[in-house]
């Protein structure tokens, strides 16, 4: 019998892409488990860092992970490869984002570290006006976002364990400014998470 290696993306493939309702369908869980029983290998292949690969995803059962857009590779519990952003480059980006009022987070395998105003901005985008709207508070209580609840606030943003850096748009600064400032050290990618707006 020929063994196969099958790679599964997470967002929009393995799980529903709406963060407030993220789940893995039972049919997918069954298919992955049956595939592995036949001797095939199943790997996650995702842009997510380990801290964003929640237990309900890992519990499906995978042989390994290619995560953080290729930033790390595991087989079982063994880390085969892990490329982190240099301290110098993290510091450069954090300084720029703080000086220019960006909302951002640092992705590491140990956590997702949020800038000061990121969580409140994401909650406004995801749920609505929590302070003044009962429907928004009800939505948050009934459909909490795995992503937002996993963000860690109040920690130093000058870290040595960063896989990737993600940010929300600052309407006062063109995206090209980010490319101009950081393309020497980063692949700067403009992307959209549908639930967080354009």
Model-based region annotation:
Residues 110-198:
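Conserved acidic, metal-coordinating active-site core of Asp-based
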Residues 28-130:
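Active-site phosphate-binding/coordination module
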Residues 1-3, 39, 101, 160-162:
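A general structural motif
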Residues 14-18, 74-77, 196-198:
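A short acidic, helix-capping loop that chelates divalent metal ions and anchors anionic groups
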Residues 3-20, 44, 93:
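Asp-based phosphoryl-transfer active-site loop
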């Amino acid at each position: 019998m020929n063994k196969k290696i099958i790679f599964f993306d997470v967002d929009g493939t393995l799980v529903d892409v709406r963060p407030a309702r993220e789940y893995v369908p039972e049919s997918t869980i069954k298919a992955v488990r049956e595939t592995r029983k036949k001797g095939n290998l199943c790997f996650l292949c995702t842009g997510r860092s380990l801290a964003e690969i929640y237990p309900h995803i890992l519990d499906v059962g995978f042989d390994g992970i290619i995560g953080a857009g290729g930033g790390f590779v595991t087989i079982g519990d063994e880390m085969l490869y892990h490329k982190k952003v240099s301290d110098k480059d993290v510091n450069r980006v954090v300084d720029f984002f703080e000086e220019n009022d960006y909302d951002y987070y640092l992705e590491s395998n140990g956590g997702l570290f949020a800038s000061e105003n990121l969580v409140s901005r994401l909650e406004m985008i995801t749920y609505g006006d929590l302070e003044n709207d009962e429907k928004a508070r009800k939505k948050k209580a009934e459909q909490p976002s795995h992503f937002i609840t996993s963000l860690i606030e109040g920690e130093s943003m000058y870290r040595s364990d960063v896989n990737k850096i993600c940010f929300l748009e600052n309407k006062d600064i063109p995206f090209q400014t980010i490319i101009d400032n950081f393309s020497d050290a980063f692949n700067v990618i403009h992307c959209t998470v549908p639930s967080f707006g354009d």
